[in-house]
């Protein structure tokens, strides 16, 4: 199913994970009226606010922003090289490793991982994640944005990294 957003908001999935390796995809179907995505994709804990602010603004979420291609957490950002911007028609890939003491997250757009990294080999992660129970999350700054999330309920557009569960379930 697709979801269209009419106000600034963040949406969290309803299944959380605190251990394991997971992969999911979000396809941005359309952008807001200003022509930019204003979208963020990533993971958040249940403490991350919804409906009032973008996730990534607090320590409870890790979000890749499609407008500027930066990773947000706790109100600050990391700028990967190259930046990973995305817009209408793009598929955002998220791989999360919650198995070891060091929790890791990777992002990719349209089949290309950040900095040409490879989650299956455990190198090149974009961010180290604090321990906790995480939910897949999507947020938007502008009305009129729609997206389609795939948490494993159908085949993925891109290859699931080696050793990762195909989906969030």
Which stretches of residues belong to each language-model region?
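PRY/SPRY (B30.2) beta-sandwich protein-interaction domains
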Residues: 1-169
């Amino acid at each position: 199913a697709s979801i269209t957003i009419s106000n600034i908001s963040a949406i969290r999935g309803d299944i959380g994970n605190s251990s394991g390796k997971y992969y999911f995809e979000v396809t941005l179907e359309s952008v807001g009226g200003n022509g930019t995505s204003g979208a963020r994709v990533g993971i958040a804990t249940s403490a991350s606010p919804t409906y009032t602010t973008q996730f990534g603004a607090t320590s409870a979420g890790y979000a890749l922003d499609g407008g500027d291609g930066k990773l947000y957490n706790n109100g600050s950002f990391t700028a990967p090289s190259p930046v990973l911007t995305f817009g209408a028609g793009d598929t955002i890939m998220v791989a999360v490793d919650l198995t070891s003491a060091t929790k890791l997250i990777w992002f990719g757009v349209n089949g290309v991982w950040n900095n040409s990294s490879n989650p299956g080999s455990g190198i090149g992660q974009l961010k180290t994640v604090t321990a906790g129970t995480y939910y897949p999350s999507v947020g938007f700054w502008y009305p009129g944005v729609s997206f389609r999330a795939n948490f494993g309920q159908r085949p993925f557009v891109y290859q699931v990294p080696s050793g990762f569960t195909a989906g969030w379930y």
